[in-house]
Design a protein with these regions (language model features):
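Acidic, PIN/NYN-like endoribonuclease modules and their adjacent C-terminal/linker elements
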Residues: 1-8, 107, 111-142
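Short, well-structured N-terminal submotif of metal-dependent ribonuclease cores
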Residues: 1-46, 56-72, 141-142
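Alpha-helix capping/helix-boundary segments
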Residues: 19-20, 50, 86, 105-106, ...
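Short active-site oxyanion
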Residues: 40-44, 75-78, 111-116
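Short beta-strand scaffold positions
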Residues: 46, 81, 101, 119-120
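Amphipathic alpha-helical segments within well-ordered protein domains
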Residues: 52-55, 91
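Short, hinge-like loop/turn segments at secondary-structure boundaries
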Residues: 61-65, 97, 134-137
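Acidic catalytic patch
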Residues: 73-97
């Protein structure tokens, strides 16, 4: 049997809204991780609800919205649509994420793909994911 040529890449990590906002502020941490993950042949997922939330938090900041528009075009990034399966799965996380739909979608994605959860707000997900799955992005730039 011939191997599939277009197998989907492995999702190694998921960016939440706070990690996307860190990138939109021009912090280097997310970009460095993106290079490492892409060099390994995997991708970092951007859940659409987290992306929408990051855009909403950046309204009026043209630089931040430009960086958000850029990151989703980069090699090594996979935008995760909110399809029926994701909506159903993410909805089950809403009660534990204090009603945060963006966080719920990102947590669901990390669990569904056994991927690292990249965040600047680890305290918000400490009860939702095992500690080894949470990767803290520094809130301040290096």
């Amino acid at each position: 049997m011939m191997p599939l040529l277009d197998e989907p890449p492995t999702i190694q990590a998921v960016l939440d809204r706070s990690a996307l906002q860190s990138y939109a502020r021009g912090h280097i941490h997310v970009g460095e991780l993106l290079i490492d993950v892409a060099d390994g042949g995997a991708v970092i997922a951007v859940p659409t609800v987290a992306l929408m939330d990051a855009y909403a938090q950046s309204l009026g900041n043209k630089h931040a919205t430009a960086l958000l528009s850029l990151i989703i075009t980069l090699p090594g990034i996979a935008v995760m649509d909110l399809d029926a399966k994701a909506a159903s799965g993410a909805a089950k996380k809403v009660p534990w994420s204090k009603g945060d739909l963006s966080r719920s979608h990102a947590v669901w994605a990390a669990k569904a793909h056994n991927a690292y959860y990249l965040t600047t707000e680890p305290a918000e997900v400490v009860d939702l994911l095992p500690p080894g799955q949470i990767h803290v992005i520094p809130h301040e730039d290096a």
